[in-house]
Amino acid sequence: MTDENIRQIAFYGKGGIGKSTTSQNTLAAMAEMGQRIMIVGCDPKADSTRLMLHAKAQTTVLHLAAERGAVEDLELEEVMLTGFRGVKCVESGGPEPGVGCAGRGIITAINFLEENGAYQDLDFVSYDVLGDVVCGGFAMPIREGKAQEIYIVTSGEMMAMYAANNIARGILKYAHSGGVRLGGLICNSRKTDREAELIENLAERLNTQMIHFVPRDNIVQHAELRRMTVNEYAPDSNQGQEYRALAKKIINNDKLTIPTPIEMDELEALLIEYGILDDDTKHAEIIGKPANAK
């Protein structure tokens, strides 16, 4: 069973936004502060723990279960490894592409962990979830009442904001039945114009906060090449301090809200206001015309 005092958080975000990197660097900083943490990777890529373990990809619960015949045939020690600063690491894994539902695998893995005592002596459990759109499968940690506190990693790019709004819509769907709340937007900067201001504006419309603006810094890539978090690779770096600042904000966060997702027209108007998207009315005469059109 799960200790009621454990805070169960989840990081969602568009594919390629830097969600797994941001979450691992933040959780490493939280572990430095004495928080007892378990990461449950819910992405079929199984890359949610690699910086903690200095590994390419951790063997997943579903992969081992398929080898053995059933998840009941596994031992906890086979699927739960210990990484940087004692962080417990598990990857749920996913089915073969085009076969089955990843969400079913996620909940199978979580139930196995709960039944085998993995949730004892922890302060935080963090679910790292694929989430361009919160489909039924990847919403499983929310639907099943596991993840209670959601952080959306986004940026000032159109598709990242579009995904953030969709994820907010998924949270709203289960907010009243399951008690899940939005903890905030994390802006993982892509250096777009007026990016912090734009995400602050989006956060306000979604009835949440931009909990932190993470600046872009090549030291993140240098650390990733070594399969390390920034906090381990360059603990005194400015970027390491940014992740520590975000970690503190999450630990102390009491602004957990029911989101108010916006309509596509409002999102487009916001993007036009900040110059991310061109106003159709300005270019009505060229919309839909090929390059060779006169």
Swiss-Prot record:
It is an enzyme of class 1 (oxidoreductase). The keyword 4Fe-4S applies. This is Nitrogenase iron protein. One of its GO terms (biological process) is nitrogen fixation. Disulfide bonds: none annotated. InterPro entries: NifH/chlL_CS (IPR030655), NifH/frxC (IPR000392), Nitrogenase_Fe_NifH (IPR005977), P-loop_NTPase (IPR027417). Its cofactor is [4Fe-4S] cluster. The keyword Nuclease does not apply. Pfam families: Fer4_NifH (PF00142). Keywords: 4Fe-4S, ADP-ribosylation, ATP-binding, Iron, Iron-sulfur, Metal-binding, Nitrogen fixation, Nucleotide-binding, Oxidoreductase. Belongs to the NifH/BchL/ChlL family. Its EC number is 1.18.6.1. The key enzymatic reactions in nitrogen fixation are catalyzed by the nitrogenase complex, which has 2 components: the iron protein and the molybdenum-iron protein. Homodimer. PROSITE patterns: NIFH_FRXC_1 (PS00746), NIFH_FRXC_2 (PS00692), NIFH_FRXC_3 (PS51026). The gene is nifH.
